[in-house]
Amino acid sequence: MNLVKEILDIAKQAPSGGNLQPWHIHAISGKKLQKIVSDIEYKIAEMPMGEKTEYDVYPPNLWDPYRSRRFKCGEDLYKSINIPREDKGARLNQLAKNLRFFGAPVGLFVYIDRKMGPPQWSDVGMFLQTVMLIAREKGLHSCAQEAWAMWHSTVNKHLVVDNKFMLFCGMGIGYADENHPINSWRTEREAVSYTHLTLPTSDLV
């Protein structure tokens, strides 16, 4: 846990408009983490899609090209671990692994004040990426997980969080099984042509 504290201490230098630093982090491990995981495992059979998020993870009626990218991402992920589209049970089991932090020994729960707006959500995103990059530099792996937002009520009760804060996501930190097929799978990305460059060539060197 000391290494995680060190990572968070460096990551706090992430860009933040007006230096608001709007991220609020709960880092847990051991019995406290297991209690949350066990509680959700007990409930998930009755509520496979959780308690509903307090924000839209994706915009309603997602449109192309974003809809197609999301669909392909999901299909390719399940294909990498040989779970066919029609095997709903296996897909739900894979989703449930999110709620065990994929076996990671440390879990972060990331909150933001409900009054904050899009610029502050952007700050939180930059903070999270900074955490992930520093973790890698320190030899650790991480996984940011918005799936935890589906269980905000349960998590809040365990952590005794003031209602003025909203659970944005979780993040598992640990050591990845680099031999597992899912950890060698990569999402496809658009070519750099998505960037509209208007600078003279001489300014790019």
Spans of features found by a protein language model:
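Conserved small/polar residues in nucleotide/adenosyl-binding loops
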Residues: 195-201
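Small-aliphatic-rich amphipathic alpha-helix that forms the alpha element of a beta-alpha
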Residues: 6-12, 106-158
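Conserved hydrophobic/aromatic beta-strand scaffold that supports enzyme active sites
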Residues: 27, 107-109, 170-172
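Short, charged/polar surface micro-motifs in flexible loops or helix N-caps
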Residues: 31-34, 114-115, 177
